[in-house]
Amino acid sequence: MLTHLDSQGRANMVDVTDKAVTSREAVAEALVRMLPATLQMIVSGGHPKGDVFAVARIAGIQAAKKTSDLIPLCHPLMLTSIKVHLAAEGDNAVRITASCKLSGQTGVEMEALTAASIAALTIYDMCKAVDRGMVIESVRLLEKLGGKSGHFIADDAQVAP
């Protein structure tokens, strides 16, 4: 059963009033593929708009905090930790990993996914003038801890211990 639908099939925000407050964490990722020259410009600090990784990191953090404003049925959450890590992968990609934590009554998967997605979109925005062929791919949940549904880890996920 989809939890965001009532008995008549109408969308509603899930009532979490009676759920226990537990520690919750989620990790998500996104990959941005680009021309090798674009990645070289980013990692060398030669982008005329500034530090692409720093701007994307801040954008991801802001996005996690704004998730309930962007996704209609998400609860507003008091996140206690948001981390966004960006790293060059090979000679033509940036891997973004975002993690969110809180003690609360609902999970933080959407916040982690939103952080990774917006960080990827920010890279695209900052670099589109030099590389319109960039591709954002593999936006996915890597790991989820806490809550009633327990621990989830993607089959091929490589998550830090």
UniProtKB/Swiss-Prot annotation:
Enzyme class: lyase
Known catalytic reactions: (8S)-3',8-cyclo-7,8-dihydroguanosine 5'-triphosphate = cyclic pyranopterin phosphate + diphosphate
CDD domains linked: MoaC_PE
Active site residues of this protein: D125
Keyword Lyase tagged: yes
Disulfide bond positions: none
Keywords: Lyase, Molybdenum cofactor biosynthesis
Transmembrane feature ranges: none
Any one GO MF annotation of this record: cyclic pyranopterin monophosphate synthase activity
EC numbers, comma separated: 4.6.1.17
Binding residue positions for substrate: L73, C74, H75, M110, E111
Family matches, as InterPro entries: MoaC, MoaC_bact/euk, MoaC_sf, MoCo_biosynth_MoaA/MoaC, Mopterin_CF_biosynth-C_dom
Pathway as given in its UniProt record: Cofactor biosynthesis; molybdopterin biosynthesis
Alphabetical GO biological process terms: Mo-molybdopterin cofactor biosynthetic process
Pfam families reported in the protein's UniProt record: MoaC
Signal peptide start and end residues: none
Subunit annotation: Homohexamer; trimer of dimers.
Family: Belongs to the MoaC family.
NCBIfam families tied to this protein: moaC, PRK09364.1
Function: Catalyzes the conversion of (8S)-3',8-cyclo-7,8-dihydroguanosine 5'-triphosphate to cyclic pyranopterin monophosphate (cPMP).
Name assigned to this protein: Cyclic pyranopterin monophosphate synthase
Organism the protein comes from: Pseudomonas syringae pv. tomato (strain ATCC BAA-871 / DC3000)
Gene: moaC
